[in-house]
């Protein structure tokens, strides 16, 4: 009937900084910053959402509060996240109520944290018809075009905004998984702190991100310098100062080492035959930070396993969701969180 036609399917990958959405009806994937700007009044009126809200980050007037609804890969402000998601889905995109959702979730979190992703769309004005969950690293593997049903062992490292998710997959399922609390934010904060201590110079988070993206952190010249804008902490005057690549490398050393140690300890816990396959198949890098210049080489050298970065690492998981939604066979990788008495309650 008509209802069948009107229904849509959405694939959601909700990161700490970016929301990635696949819209089946339009066959498009879009990305927005996972941020809301509120007016600091009694009602907390919405001032801006998504990319618009993010553009004010660090420069917003004092009566505007900027909020990131996700923290370390899970939903920390449920109502804000629900509002933001509905707002973005409806924004001029012919939003269909009664749609179906497939959501990528991290593995190494509590059942309550997992269920929150499900609750987000089931208890909303979106009136979801069906909600299925898929583990993000499984979605990543599908997005990478890997044969997860038959592989003897692969490792995926998803470098995100506030977390790095490490997974060992074999024979169609998850063998081991660990969520490390290191991400883009960790690196940027480290850069801000070191620049502050060594130069008495305060730079913003976006400037730190530019430094992180522009310097090859591991190889290449050790004498490159970038001039960046900030505020001199002694005079209080805004100015530009040169920052060296060596300083940036020093700032990123510890968080990177933490990721490497986590990879090594996961490999140590991996069954020998699966580990042997990982040494042959390699480590696959996904997530918005996987594009960090030189990251691939660094991991390869430190861990001793060939590392490969996805072509579009930041949309790898949502591309996987798209494939899962399109394929009857891959749909088996998803699971529903609807309890038996749940349909009756609605």
Give each language-model segment a name.
Residues 165-167:
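A structural feature that tracks compact, well-ordered secondary-structure segments
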Residues 1-159, 169-283, 290-317, 322-346:
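Nucleotide/phosphate-binding catalytic cleft detector across ATP-hydrolyzing
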């Amino acid at each position: 009937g008509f209802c069948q036609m009107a229904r849509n399917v959405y694939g959601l990958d909700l990161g700490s900084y970016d929301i990635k959405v696949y819209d089946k009806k339009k066959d498009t994937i879009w990305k927005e910053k996972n941020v809301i700007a509120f007016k600091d009044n009694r009602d907390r009126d919405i001032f801006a959402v998504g990319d618009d809200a993010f553009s004010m980050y660090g420069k917003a007037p004092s009566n505007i509060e900027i909020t990131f609804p996700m923290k370390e890969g899970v939903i920390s402000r449920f109502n804000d996240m629900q509002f933001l998601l509905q707002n973005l889905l409806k924004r001029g995109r012919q939003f269909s109520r009664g749609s179906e959702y497939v959501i990528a979730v991290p593995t190494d979190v509590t059942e309550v944290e997992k269920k929150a992703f499900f609750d987000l769309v089931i208890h909303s004005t979106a009136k979801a018809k069906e909600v299925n969950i898929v583990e993000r690293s499984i979605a990543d593997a599908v997005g990478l075009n890997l044969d997860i049903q038959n592989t003897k062992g692969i490792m995926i490292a998803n470098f995100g905004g506030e977390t790095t998710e490490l997974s060992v997959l074999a024979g169609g399922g998850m063998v081991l998984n660990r969520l490390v609390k290191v991400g883009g934010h960790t690196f940027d904060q480290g850069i801000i702190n070191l620049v502050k201590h060594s130069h008495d110079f305060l730079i913003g988070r976006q400037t730190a991100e530019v430094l992180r993206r522009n310097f090859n952190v591991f190889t290449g010249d050790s004498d490159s310098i970038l001039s960046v804008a900030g505020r001199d902490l002694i005079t209080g005057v805004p100015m530009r100062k040169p920052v060296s690549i060596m300083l940036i490398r020093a700032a990123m050393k510890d968080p990177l080492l933490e990721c490497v140690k986590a990879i090594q300890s996961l490999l140590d816990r991996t069954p020998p035959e699966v580990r042997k396959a990982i040494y042959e198949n390699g480590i696959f890098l996904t997530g918005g930070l996987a594009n960090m210049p030189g990251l691939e080489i660094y991991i390869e050298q430190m861990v001793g396993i060939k590392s490969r970065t996805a072509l579009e690492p930041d949309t790898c998981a949502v591309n996987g969701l798209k494939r899962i939604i399109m394929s009857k066979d891959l749909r088996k990788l998803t699971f529903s969180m609807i309890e038996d008495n749940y349909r009756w309650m609605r």
